[in-house]
């Protein structure tokens, strides 16, 4: 039975599902203990699941067997978008420098190296993955050795550090341990993981001894490109409306839950949403329309988890479409249209409630249309944060010419998407659409 620690806005729903799937919940919060009446087990997890920064998904990190089992169950139940990293977190490898700040690792993957390190091109050494590569986003590796256990990590940083989730009183206790019985390891580099706050001293000391012997062995290195120590598997898992409806249903089987709960939770409603859950008020459409007033922030979420944020001012809901005006910064070039952005340029963005696209029409300082960019995406969620997941393929209209963009990029990453989202052009609108202050029009 794999042990999983779950945190964040999806915690109740995912806990309900994980228990049904046969996982053991460890290090539960007080709310989870109360809601599910489960055993209070504070042993280290095999797997951690927590919010993605977009609040429209989670990151999954842990031992690879537990990771694969959990992702399989997620896929069967939620049909989400899943972007797996191409290297493990804290994977240790022998690499060859291909620049002062780049190293080639296993499978020819090139990692960025933090600026505080300067490499000699052509030189080899031992590196640890700090940030794994996902999608087109490069990974980051440091010319240090880190060996991670359940409670501590030994590394070659020369510092003693603590997980941000360890409170001050526990840091004092663990700090004393580092200065006394762990002194020989602390002088090399020691990081206390969050599970250390639940462990007794003997457990920590025993683990540190084992990790130290492994660190010494890893310091001998290996041939360039060799994986010397496997890291934890990592993935970004994103939920669209369909996935969130399943999560809403799972949560509702444990505690009172209104329709649209998880979409509303991403809006940061706090106690207001707790009140809606308690009363059972079915007001999702009205609530998000109310929240979509004044300043809004559009979260354009890439399938690998990268978030592009666009600020705008909502002009209102016009004919069932949320219209947002966005100023454009002069100097750049309109993507896919090729027109240079001049002073006074702006975009009107039309966001339908129930379609799989968002329409951006660009205007010059004299209010003339410059071109239109249609982004194909998951069904948008309205609110003060407008959230959707990019399906990578786009269409543009400019100067009487229609273009389809980024098909090659979609083909490269289409395995991230469930089958139902693997033909994005079928989800695109027909006709030539423009976004105006009064909503969408067909030209």
Swiss-Prot record:
InterPro entries: DUF402, FomD-like_sf, Ntdp-like, RNA-bd_FAU-1. GO terms for biological process: rRNA processing. Gene3D superfamilies: FomD-like. Keywords: Endonuclease, Hydrolase, Nuclease, RNA-binding, rRNA processing. One of its GO terms (molecular function) is mRNA 3'-UTR AU-rich region binding. It holds the Pfam family DUF402. Probable RNase involved in rRNA stability through maturation and/or degradation of precursor rRNAs. Binds to RNA in loop regions with AU-rich sequences. Belongs to the FAU-1 family. This is Probable ribonuclease FAU-1. It comes from Pyrobaculum aerophilum (strain ATCC 51768 / DSM 7523 / JCM 9630 / CIP 104966 / NBRC 100827 / IM2). The lineage of its organism: Archaea, Thermoproteota, Thermoprotei, Thermoproteales, Thermoproteaceae.
